Structure formats: structure tokens, C-alpha cells
């Protein structure tokens, strides 16, 4: 749950109107509005993945598919390992076991084995990232190089999503993630035969 959510705004200069900063001027009054960005194609790498290393408290990731990808020259798994070493709570829900290259890369970071929290659910098809309970990405991009990573613009997938700190959207995303994480749907699930470790 996102009970720790705190509305964050970027104090812009007087007279600057921007939904992206969460601050604008109307009739002499400062009005705070949520940030809402449309994210497409390579924006996923610039606007979403770039935020991962900057979280302070928690990072929740939901994805159907997961493969090895890079953030600049560093493996994404290395970035997650760095977060865990800083004490950040990292949770990952994915739908299927990743391939051998990912598993080999995963094993290079002992902290991932000991501290990364993971849930495998074959019904998960949502793609989301929740940053510090304050900002959320919701969209089509899986956690792969072609989806959200840095694959070239001529080879990557066409993806779309939103990045927002609007409270109701962040809270709804947290609640959906939390329900899957806690196994709320496990008991009556019609696909238990495909699940290696039901939570309930």
C-alpha cells in the first residue's frame, strides 16, 4: 500500500506554467497539479529507466517478460544490486522465468540472491514501476532491451505509457501490485497448475 505517499512538487519560477513541474500560476495564485507525461518508444529509457538509480526508499517493478538489459554501460541487475546495498526495498513481479543469460548475470550479484524480493505469477501482464511510492510508470513496455531498455530506435519496440505522480493513479497501481504480491488472487486462481509457488 502507498500510505507513505507524499505529494511532491517542483517549485517553478513565478509565471511558469507546466504540468510537468506540478506548479503553475493562475490569477495570481500558485496551484499545484500532478505531473503527467506521455511516454513513447525511446522515452522509456530516458524518462523511466533513468529514474531507477535515483530512488531512495523503494522500487516496485511489475512486468510480464524480463531479460538482461543495460543502463548506459551497466547491467540493469547491477543497478538493482546497488539499490539493495543502499537499503532500498526492491520488489519484482514477473510472469515467467527469465532465460539463461539473465540468470547468469543475476548470479554475479550475491545481494540479489539474498535480498531481492521476487514473486512469479503467470497471470501478470501489467507493466509498471513505482518509484518511492510517489511516481508510477504504467504502460506497455516489458523489462527488456527492446521494450524499456536502450536498444536502437530502428530496432526497439513501439511502446506507450504514462509517467505520473497523480495520487489516485499511484495509489491504484500500488494497490494492484500489492494484491498480486500478497497472493490475494491465488486461492481461487484458475491457473494454479501453471504456478510453481502459489502464495496461498
Regions found by a protein language model. Name each.
Residues 48-112:
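Primarily the HKD phosphodiesterase
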Amino acid at each position: 500500500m502507498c500510505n507513505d505517499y507524499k505529494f511532491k512538487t517542483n517549485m517553478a519560477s513565478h509565471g511558469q506554467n507546466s504540468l510537468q513541474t506540478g506548479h503553475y500560476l493562475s490569477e495570481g495564485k500558485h496551484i499545484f497539479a500532478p505531473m503527467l507525461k506521455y511516454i513513447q518508444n525511446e522515452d522509456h529509457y530516458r524518462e523511466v529507466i533513468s529514474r531507477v538509480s535515483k530512488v531512495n526508499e523503494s522500487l516496485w517493478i511489475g512486468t510480464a517478460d524480463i531479460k538482461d538489459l543495460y543502463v548506459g554501460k551497466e547491467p540493469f541487475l547491477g543497478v538493482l544490486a546497488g539499490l539493495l546495498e543502499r537499503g532500498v526495498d526492491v520488489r519484482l513481479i514477473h510472469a515467467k522465468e527469465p532465460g539463461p543469460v539473465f540468470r547468469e548475470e543475476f548470479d554475479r550479484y550475491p545481494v540479489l540472491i539474498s535480498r531481492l524480493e521476487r514473486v512469479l505469477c503467470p497471470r501478470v501482464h501489467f507493466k509498471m514501476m513505482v518509484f518511492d511510492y510517489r511516481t508510477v510508470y504504467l504502460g506497455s513496455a516489458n523489462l527488456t532491451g527492446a521494450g524499456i531498455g536502450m536498444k536502437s530506435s530502428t530496432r526497439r519496440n513501439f511502446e506507450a505509457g504514462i509517467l505520473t505522480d497523480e495520487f489516485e493513479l499511484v495509489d491504484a497501481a500500488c494497490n494492484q501490485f500489492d494484491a498480486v504480491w500478497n497472493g490475494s488472487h491465488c486461492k481461487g486462481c484458475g491457473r494454479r497448475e501453471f504456478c510453481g509457488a502459489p502464495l496461498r
